[in-house]
Design a protein with these regions (language model features):
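Terminal, low-structured helical/coil segments at or just beyond the last alpha-helical repeat
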Residues: 232-251, 531-536, 543, 548-603
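Generic helix N-cap/helix-start motif at coil->alpha-helix transitions
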Residues: 22-31, 56-66, 91-103, 127-136, ...
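Solenoid-like repeat scaffolds
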Residues: 16-25, 50-59, 85-95, 121-130, ...
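Residue-level recognition of tetratricopeptide repeat
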Residues: 34, 69, 106, 139, ...
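TPR-repeat structural position
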Residues: 9-13, 42, 77, 114, ...
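Alpha-helical segment of the N-proximal tetratricopeptide repeat
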Residues: 2-11, 28-41, 241-277
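Register position in tetratricopeptide repeats
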Residues: 38, 73, 110-111, 143, ...
Length: 603
């Protein structure tokens, strides 16, 4: 950092607040920018960028943009333009990259020239990815108080027919996500303008596209009138700019994903471009909890728990949600005392508006910590605070998972039934089937699972749930194998489905093939681990006379928070070894074309 300071480089107060400090209070030094990103240290990241030569920064067009955003956060728009190589004059800057020109339109808005910024935006935003140029214009129009023009933008972006995805793997989900963004913002703007009936009518377009989610949509539509759970503030220039930047970051991430998939690849590892973009956005709008949560989630997914906790704990104002996020990261990082303290603090500052959502997070973390008494004390309050059917269904769903974790399977099944009664969706039915299976009500569970398969024959996770149930809760191994083979065909890169299919092979005695498939599932999940995959590998290694590897896998399973009932069984295996006999090898079931028939569009 000293080299950058010597060259006249200065950080904004927002950036300085993100600095990770060593025990002596000095900023941590990093060997390369990626290390600073993984620590959630925007100050360290920008310092390394500033220390590069101009030629080095030009290797990535966003490096100068991030430094420019920090200058903008400090109120120095002239310094921001200097990093972008802009003069602020349209005639002088016309050869600059389109993204830089788009940034310049927002710099004009930050300077207070909103009408000029809007005109500039309309001139330069045509090359922005996807619909981000239009969304950005709508945000700028609203920040300028030109709400009717912003509404017209949203109207133009809304299609006449809205089609929801059939399942999680349906590519239509990408389109639906963009449409949902448009409709939600349209609806919220109308609500801010006091046009409640129109706001509800717009939002109902999403509800009509997903009739099975009627309970959740009804609660959301009602909140547009009551304001419950709705923090709907008018956009300012800074919050509008941050929103537009976030849209661009998401769109570019989606483009990278689609391009990789089209080339036969798979998205793996830490997305440093999205992380650096989001951390820079937080310089403009540090209080934006949605963007902050996205950064935390990205770091968490890559097992960068220290970085996730740091980002959660360095917000300008703390909140119960951020404390719960910090607690989760601290827990997974091995600091259980600090995690418990963060949970306690989150509950202590939660008010009536966020008490229910805080309880959701606190309960799940108490379960992972095996704090049974504390968890059971919170369940009645959770159920009492839930008011509308959507909240009550969610509360019963959480209660079911808590009781399930601690082995109270009958109580868990009862709450899962209540959740389904209140909110009869595919997700609730699948959770109920699992709870019934855990409670020994196998036939009732199978009725649900088979019905869901008939309704969603090309949903890989529905097939996975049925197939895995058949091989673990019944003796219908052959049928389970065939169902899982179809799931694999539809989602061959999904590690959880690969684990299930591998376990079907194990049950049929093909242990070597099972090992290879489940080991690949483990590798695909890295740097995360899953207790069930490790537990499966432990059993496989034991039967292959790899006793040390088996014990190591079971130990890893225990470190990754299995349910209590499974924890007891794994601990017994660690102590006494595996007592169940090696599965007898059987001929693998023949799979007909009918079993695997899948339309190409479904793949």
């Amino acid at each position: 950092m000293a080299e950058a300071e010597a060259s006249g480089f200065a950080l904004s107060p927002a950036a300085l607040a993100t600095s990770v400090r060593s025990v002596d209070g000095k900023p941590v030094a990093y060997g390369k920018p990626l290390d600073a990103l993984k620590a959630g240290d925007t100050a360290g990241y920008l310092t390394l960028l500033a220390g590069m030569t101009e030629a080095q920064r030009k290797e990535d067009r966003f490096y100068n943009a991030y430094l420019a955003l920090d200058r903008a956060a400090a109120g120095d728009t002239a310094g921001a333009r200097a990093y972008l190589g802009l003069t602020g004059g349209a005639e002088d800057d016309y050869e600059a990259p389109g993204f830089y020109l788009w940034l310049d339109s927002w710099l004009m808005a930050l300077d207070g020239d909103l009408d000029g910024a809007i005109n500039r935006h309309r001139e330069v935003a045509s090359g922005m990815p996807g619909i981000t140029g239009d969304l950005s214009l709508a945000a700028m129009l609203e920040a300028a108080g030109r709400n009717e023009e912003a509404l017209a933008v949203y109207d133009a972006l809304t299609p006449t027919v809205i089609q929801a995805p059939e399942h999680e793997f349906d590519p239509q989900g990408i389109v639906f996500a963009h449409i949902s963004t448009v409709i939600v913002r349209h609806s919220l703007l109308l609500q801010r303008m006091g046009r409640i009936a129109e706001s509800q009518a717009v939002y109902k377009k999403l509800a009509d596209a997903e009739p099975e989610q009627a309970t959740s949509y009804a609660a959301a539509i009602d909140s547009l009138e009551t304001g419950k759970n709705l923090d709907n503030k008018s956009l300012t220039t800074k919050t509008g700019f941050a929103l537009a930047l976030s849209d661009v970051a998401y769109a570019m991430q989606q483009q990278r994903f689609i391009q990789t998939v089209m080339m036969g690849g798979n998205i793996e590892g830490f997305d440093d471009q999205r992380a650096s973009f989001d951390l820079a956005i937080l310089l403009i709008d540090p209080a934006n909890e949605n963007i902050r949560s996205g950064v935390i989630d990205a770091l968490y997914e890559e097992a960068l728990y220290d970085g996730a906790a740091h980002v959660a704990q360095t917000a300008p104002e703390t909140s119960p949600a951020l404390m719960i996020s910090a607690a989760q990261a601290l827990l997974m990082g091995g600091d259980e005392p600090s995690a418990r303290k963060a949970i306690k603090n989150a509950l202590s500052i939660a008010d009536n508006d966020d008490r229910l959502s805080t309880l959701y997070g606190a309960l799940q973390l108490r379960a992972l910590l095996n704090d049974k008494g504390e968890a059971y004390e919170l369940v009645p309050e959770l159920l009492r605070l839930a008011e509308n059917p959507a909240e009550k269904a969610a509360a019963h769903g959480i209660a079911s998972s808590i009781y399930q974790h601690f082995g109270d399977t009958s109580e868990a099944a009862d709450h899962a039934r209540d959740a389904r009664r209140l909110d009869d969706t595919h997700e609730r039915r699948m959770v109920l089937a699992d709870a019934l299976g855990q409670a020994g009500q196998i036939n009732d569970a199978l009725v649900i699972l088979r019905s869901e398969r008939l309704a969603r024959p090309n949903d890989p996770y529905t097939l996975n749930s049925l197939g895995y149930f058949l091989i673990t809760r019944t003796d219908k191994y052959e049928e389970g194998y065939k169902v899982l083979a179809r799931a694999m065909l539809l989602a061959e890169t999904d590690p959880y489905i690969a684990d299930s299919f591998g376990w079907a092979l194990y049950k049929l005695g093909d242990i070597e093939r099972a090992k290879g498939l489940i080991e690949s599932a483990r590798d695909d999940l890295l740097p995360q681990n899953h207790w069930e995959i490790e537990n499966h590998l432990g059993d496989i290694y034991w039967h292959l006379d790899r006793k040390d590897d088996a014990r190591k896998a079971w130990e890893t399973a225990l470190e990754n928070y299995p349910p209590n009932s499974e924890r007891v069984l794994i601990e017994e295996k660690l102590k006494d070894g595996l007592k169940t006999p090696k599965p007898e090898k059987r001929p693998l079931p023949e799979i007909s074309l009918e079993d695997l028939e899948v339309e190409r569009r479904d793949i």
